[in-house]
């Protein structure tokens, strides 16, 4: 029997959080080995575990996978969260790319220089309210199902829920004009595996604080 996937990353959200979310939604238990010092990262590099000398890295099925999208694609395929055919997969990919674009925009706000934060936060809110959330509200309305693609859970539902929770952290009022997205959020949050991941004490990570940012800067030298 194969062991649990092992996730190598800093003890924070970053580019690993969507991977944690997808594994959790699939009901897959995983272990985490946190990179806590520059030496930890250097050892992974010297041991040949990081193809491009960067994390996240996931050990799964005898492989050491890097690149977030490649990891997500593998997990989604392995656990049947990638649609039933090529057309569904194309929609899933298209929606996912938009979700990840906004997720990254919001996630980067905490790292903005103070003199840029107000403007970039305003831009993120504008894109959220006027570009991305209307697009997904429209998808839910036209598709008429509980899920974004097909009639069962896929990876894109998990990614969208994660994004909606980040939007709430940014400004909860941004969701107010979108009743279908609000209902979607409640519906997906109530799925047993997702509900468990949302419960305190899970491997879900909180927003970055100043201390974590400083520790990350020391480890990753950015």
Swiss-Prot record:
Residue positions where N6-succinyllysine is found in the record: 4
Domain GST C-terminal: from-to ranges: 85-208
UniProt record similarity statement: Belongs to the GST superfamily. Alpha family.
Highest classification ranks of the organism: Eukaryota, Metazoa, Chordata, Craniata, Vertebrata
GO terms under biological process: glutathione metabolic process; response to bacterium; response to stilbenoid
Catalytic activity: RX + glutathione = an S-substituted glutathione + a halide anion + H(+)
The EC number(s) this enzyme carries: 2.5.1.18
Record's protein name: Glutathione S-transferase A2
Oligomeric form and interacting partners: Homodimer. Heterodimer of GSTA1 and GSTA2.
Pfam families: GST_C, GST_N
Keywords of the record: Acetylation, Transferase
GO cellular component: cytosol; mitochondrion
Biological role: Catalyzes the conjugation of glutathione to a large variety of electrophilic compounds.
Residue numbers bearing the N-acetylalanine modification: 2
EC top class, as a word: transferase
Domain GST N-terminal residue range list: 3-83
């Amino acid at each position: 029997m194969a062991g649990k996937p092992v996730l190598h990353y800093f003890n924070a959200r970053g580019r690993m959080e969507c991977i944690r979310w997808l594994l959790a939604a699939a009901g897959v238990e995983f272990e985490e080995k946190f990179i806590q010092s520059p030496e930890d990262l250097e050892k992974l590099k010297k041991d040949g575990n990081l193809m491009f000398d960067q994390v996240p890295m996931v050990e799964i099925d005898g492989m050491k996978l890097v690149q977030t999208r490649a990891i997500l694609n593998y997990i989604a395929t392995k656990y049947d969260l990638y649609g039933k055919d090529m057309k569904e997969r194309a929609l899933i990919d298209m929606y996912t790319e938009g979700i990840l674009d906004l997720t990254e925009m919001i996630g980067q706000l905490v790292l903005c220089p103070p003199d840029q934060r107000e403007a970039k936060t305003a831009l993120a809110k504008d894109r959220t309210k006027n570009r991305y959330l209307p697009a997904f509200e429209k998808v839910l309305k036209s598709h008429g199902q509980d899920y974004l693609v097909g009639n069962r859970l896929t990876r894109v539902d998990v990614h969208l829920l994660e994004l909606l929770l980040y939007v709430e952290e940014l400004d909860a009022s941004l969701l107010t004009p979108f009743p279908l997205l609000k209902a979607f959020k409640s519906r997906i949050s109530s799925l047993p595996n997702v509900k468990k991941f949302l419960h305190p004490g899970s491997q879900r990570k909180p927003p970055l604080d100043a201390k974590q940012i400083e520790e990350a800067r020391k480890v990753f030298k950015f």
